[in-house]
Amino acid sequence: VTKQFRSPRFTLLAMAFAVSGCASLAPDSPAPGIAAGMPPAFEQGEADGRYQPARWWTSFEDPVLDNLLDEALSKNLDLAEASARLRAAEARARISKSGLFPQINAGLDSSYSDSPTAGTSFGAVAGGGRLQNETYSSSLAFSYELDIWGKLRNDARAGRADAIASAADLQAVRLAVLAEAITSYFDIVDARHQIALTTRIIDVLGDRVEQSENRYSRGLITSFELYQVRQDFRNVQASLPQRESQLAATEGQLAVLVGRYANNMDELIGGSLTPKLDFAPVPSGLPIDLLAQRPDVFAEGQRLESARYNLGARRAERFPSLSLSASTGSQAGAASDVFDIFDNWVLNLGAGLTAPLFQGGRIQANIEVADAEYAQQTAVYARTVLTAYQEVTTAIERYEEERQRYRFLFSQLDEAEAAAGLQSRRFANGVGSYVDYLDALRAQYQVESSLSSAARDVALARLGVHRALGGSWDDVPQAPDIMAAPSAIQGEN
């Protein structure tokens, strides 16, 4: 028995294992680099810019915002859905990888037969004898397809790349949830400021209407001027319910992002909201490799790899496949002897070669489909990279513009406050009118309103830079490893 297990048949089997996996019909990997003709760095920005940590939103130094985003990351339903999709993709990757390994099955069987003995037609009815037989067997079966042309390997690699793309999709959803939550938060901060300022302006205009009515009664202004003041007052009054409605709608959107009902947000944003604006410029010369950390760019790159490997697998279907099989076990007439493998053992070895001769054009059509999908994904990846570059440059330019706009409005606020203070002193000293003071105070509130909106726009423009770069701009990743996999897949190598 021992000599049989060392026979040339098993040597041939070992050689077949070594030969399998030496070929691949997938196209060559695309040239390294994100896109041809792209500059090595983003030229926008200022040299004295400082970088942000991975949790870049902490630069706003707002614990309310930090808690809100932690809540969103833990309870957002879009993230829960994306996490489930990732688990499914990882499971599919393991399914596609299973074809690389031998299939081993074990079995236990028993059978019983009762038949007439030879020479009788009706057995016991005719007085003849009967033959009764019991058989018990155990088996261990082995089968393996040699991956000579790389079909199974390419299928496994395609599944793995799809799983990595799903992991990047999860990061894209995470970034989108953060961006939407931060946007809603700053919209709420600005809306509350606008409501407070609108209320102050209404009070000022109410006094202005009263003063105008007194002046009209004394013949100092015309009825047209009085109507204009009243109309202005009513217009501002009418804007207050609209602002309050917008605030409620934004709070409702934020509630959905954190997985809550809109009437259950007081503990998160019920108090004072005081985020600190970060006006640090974006550093100049950011390396173009930062685009590689964008989840959408990385995901489409992995889908391009998946399409490449899928094309290789479909090409391999044109060639013969070689499969090996072996089974061993025991067979006995009594259940107690079935595990007596030394006296009752059975061994079967087999090999099969299957070559496609005629498939009605199915194989060639599958190759053409895979080739078209590869070309399609190449275009998708190129478009994604170009779009990402355009979004980064636009976001950096917008951030610089919003910073300048905020500086101008801040200077204008200093002037408006000085004008209101001057009119207040003139009125107190009896050399100025109360109407002039009210007009100056209203102008100050209007500048404060514009400055509040500008502060929100600066924060959202900075958010736009982070989102366009896929997060922070401090950690420049290495060139992405197309075979890097989530931990759940790596653990099976």
Language-model features: locations:
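Periplasmic alpha-helical coiled-coil/stalk elements that build and connect Gram-negative outer-membrane
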Residues: 152, 168-286, 398, 402, ...
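Sec/SRP-type N-terminal targeting helices
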Residues: 80-81, 97, 146-174, 224, ...
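Membrane-embedded beta-strand positions in outer-membrane beta-barrel channels/transporters
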Residues: 69, 137-141, 185, 287, ...
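Terminal intrinsically disordered/low-complexity segments used for targeting and assembly
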Residues: 2-74, 121-123, 136, 160, ...
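Alpha-helical heptad-repeat coiled-coil segments that mediate oligomerization/polymerization in large
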Residues: 219-222, 388, 395, 430-434
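A short glycine-centered flexible hinge/capping loop motif at secondary-structure junctions
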Residues: 216-220, 427-431, 468-472
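Short flexible linkers and secondary-structure junctions
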Residues: 23-182, 322-326, 344, 357-367, ...
